[in-house]
Amino acid sequence: RAYKPAYRVMTASYARLLPLLARRETLRQQKEHVFVAIDGMAASGKTTLAAQLEHFYGADCGVIHMDDFFLPLPLRTQERYAEPGGNIHYERFGQQIIAAMGEKYFSYERYDCATGTYSSMRQENRPIMVLEGSYSLHPYFGHPYDLCVFLEISSQEQTARILKRNGAEWYRDFEEKWIPMEQ
């Protein structure tokens, strides 16, 4: 007799995916495409979770990052920054991503805030599309997603992760600017 185990071994980092994977599988039986939004606090693991989903599902998963929709310099005003999510060009995200969710292929302009330039991206609408980053659940978009995830983190862990990822010089920007904008 061939041994057929009824269990699977996975790393602990993937264990947190189980409820999300189960919900996604239920939705997949009802829909050809499942749109997942991952929003949350700075350094809470949004990009990591999106990468884990992309690794798990392989070619069936595409990821769009909200960082590609950072607000360009000419649009940055005090009034705009006073809005929730004002550092994101949510209008462009709505036009180029949300409006194209039903298309087989879509194009968008990826903004590089370090150079202030755009690059054209072409994306196939995969069976699982993950829209990852702060403000991906911005009210401006309505409720276009099939599955919404919001990640939280303690302030102590957030500080440790930001220092490790961005260094002490950038931590001050997070502490004084980006974290307060998320609250």
Task: State the predicted function of each range.
Residues 43:
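Walker A (P-loop) phosphate-binding loop of P-loop NTPases
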Residues 40:
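The Walker A (P-loop) glycine that initiates the GxxxxGKT/S ATP-binding motif of P-loop NTPases
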Residues 46:
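Conserved lysine of the Walker
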Residues 138, 167-183:
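Small-molecule kinase domains that catalyze NTP-dependent phosphoryl transfer to phosphate-bearing small molecules
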Residues 1-16:
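Charged, amphipathic alpha-helical linker segments immediately N-terminal to NTP-binding catalytic cores
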Residues 62, 71-117, 128:
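Conserved nucleotide-sensing/catalytic segment adjacent to the nucleotide-binding pocket
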Residues 117-165:
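ATP-dependent NMP and nucleoside kinases share a basic, alpha-helical "lid"
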Residues 49:
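Hydrophobic positions on the alpha1 helix immediately C-terminal to the Walker A/P-loop
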